[in-house]
Design a protein with these regions (language model features):
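Acidic, glycine-rich loop-and-beta core segments that form the ion-binding/anion-interacting portion
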Residues: 216-233
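A helix-coil-helix interface module used to build multimeric assemblies
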Residues: 1-202, 206-215, 219-220
Length: 233
């Protein structure tokens, strides 16, 4: 398939270099986030008059089809593609033709991958937080049922003082409460949308970054384009 970069070069990229740069082996896990981000980007482009309503509908239908086929196993993500972005774009063009080539208007793979990573991390945080919440509920139940269940407390592997099972379990309850707080803090810190940052300094297209951020559930857009595409913390 054609590369999404390399217009200045006349010779084909050496296979070793191509394989070294390829990220499909690990960023294929971002396929849902990549498609979600693309749908929001396309909705914004249409709202700004950069795409027609017909083009928007075509692209969205194509993206929905790709998502459904990957989920069902009908479509496989292979090493033929350099990264998840090229996989989605190539399959979209195969499905809907030239309209698919407009998917990347006003966007770089730099701000796109930054978005994918943020969406993925946020999804993982939310999933983990829900699991910790259920764990805390289970621990709470054990504590309530064992207020008068006595056991030895240990220091240095030696029996030291009597405690209740509720108190013992309560120690872990407090630890996991702190873990939930840390997850919430991470989510708050990273919940800004990098789309619109472009390769490093934005774009001349009249994008509405606030609208894209809103569609994707972010608190707002990132404030500095260079930070947006270099931020991996």
């Amino acid at each position: 398939m054609a590369q999404l970069w390399g217009g200045r070069f006349t010779k084909e990229t050496d296979k070793l270099v191509y394989n070294f740069n390829a990220s499909i082996s690990f960023d294929q896990k971002f396929y849902e986030q990549d498609i979600r981000g693309s749908k929001a980007h396309v909705a914004m482009l249409a709202r700004q008059g950069i795409l027609t309503a017909e083009e928007k509908d075509q692209i969205e239908a194509g993206l929905d089809g790709i998502l459904a086929d990957v989920r069902s196993g009908k479509l496989e993500i292979t090493s033929e593609y350099e990264d998840i972005h090229s996989f989605v774009e190539a399959n979209l063009i195969d499905r809907i033709g030239d309209a698919g080539k407009k998917l990347h208007t006003g966007r770089s793979r730099n701000d796109q991958v930054a978005l994918d990573m943020k969406l993925y991390v946020r999804d993982e945080i939310d999933e983990t937080d829900e699991l910790v919440k259920k764990l805390l509920e289970a621990l709470q139940k054990i504590m309530e049922e064992n207020v008068h269940t006595y056991m030895p407390g240990f220091t240095h592997l030696q029996k030291a003082q009597p405690v209740t099972l509720a108190h013992h379990v309560g120690a872990y309850f407090e630890m996991f409460v702190r873990d939930r707080s840390r997850l919430a803090d991470i989510r708050k810190r990273m919940n800004t949308c990098p789309l619109g940052a472009g390769a490093l300094a934005g774009t001349t297209y009249p994008l509405d970054r606030e609208y894209t951020a809103q569609l994707l559930g972010f608190d707002g857009p990132t404030r500095n384009s260079m930070d947006s595409v270099s931020d991996r913390d």
